[in-house]
Amino acid sequence: MGKAFDCTPKVVKRVDTEFRKIVTPIPAPESVPVLETLRRCEPVSMTGQPPIVWDRADGFQVYDRFGNMWLDWSSGVLVTNAGHAPKEIKQAIVDQVEKGLLHNYCFPNAERAVLAEYLSKIAPAPLKKVFLLTTGSEATECAVKLARTHGLKAGGPEKIGIVSFEGGFHGRTLGAQMIGGIPSLKQWIVNLDPDIHQVPFPDGFRTRDTSFDFFLKTLADKGVKPGRVAGVILETFQGGGASFAPTEYIQALAKWCREHNILLIFDEIQAAFGRTGKLFGFEHYGVVPDLMCCGKGISSSLPVAAVIGRADVMDIYGPAEMTSTHSGNPICVAAALASVKKIVEGGLIENARAMGDILLEGLQQIAKRHAGIVGALHGRGLVAGLHMVRRGGKEPDGDIAFSIVEKAFQKGLLLFAPVGFGGGTVKIAPPLTITKEAILEGVAALGEAIDEASAEHAAR
């Protein structure tokens, strides 16, 4: 089971800088009644994040009602790519609300048409059909459904296999967790699909062999033949560690998929819309998938997701056979269009690339200083993961990672709870609007948190 942060107010050092302000004990004593209500009325699973009661957020900063201000390195779990509450998104939402159309199911509306066309134009060929959804889990399950249906039509009842990767995360619904690669999240599933096959992810840290031959050998050892595979799905970078695969591996994978009429699916839910310094993360690999799943940063705010893909695949189902209750909700669509336009046309992709270089340089210095407990640093653009390990080895150290996040929170630097293998990865993902000065200040604060956590754990 994951760990909950302590909700008992603790006196901490005051902070007052351009980007951070801590003026109360943490959490703020006045916020405790709200925290207690949430813990009383919500499931325990909702207690896993640092106990700040958000009041408002702007740009790359988050505020409570009690005078505290955090530099946000979470983006609300990689959602607010365009920044928190930018005026363009707020105005788009207000305009749509005032227009008076709040929901219309799958009946046509102009707003949905504009967003679908815009996404179709910015996506590379042949990804020209757009199916709007609500959540990332919905998108990944839809992509697998399309891949299997395509496989059945192309190769008959035996071509239904789905290949995914160990350590991968594709959502929390049944199908999404079956294709996911985290065993602890599957313990409740008593009848795992025997036609879902997993292979090691070539991150170069926990999987040393990053050759595509290892992929082929793993499938062969499992008795999986290419003719029985309908699709391969992978995160563009593994969310649990911000880990990318080697370019040559992905290019070989794409070639193998083409040769065997297998759909290649990129889960871009964390990677798309500028996060990695490219519009779509798969651009780093020089390939184009058959389907991609989008979410999170597509709207920088409201719930929107999408599957974007080849027309022949997207059109497999006939009228009314593949729909969703809230597909293309007009308010969410308005937010998404404003978000994507701001990212694409407002220089945020370029900023992510430039600021990412500064971020990774600073993190490399921290990793070098703490080489005994930082097993690896992964990332590109404005996403990074510090893989914390038990001193001198590769075993993940979830305790020190948790301590680092907690200490950073007390210093006015907001990260979400550790993720990845053994809960050992401190993940960093600020809004793409962040500035050089804010990054440098955040790196310094994170360095202090790691210094303190390292000293405390060494003394135990």
Regions found by a protein language model. Give the residues of each.
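Conserved N-terminal phosphate-binding loop of PLP-dependent enzymes in the Aspartate aminotransferase
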Residues: G2-R460
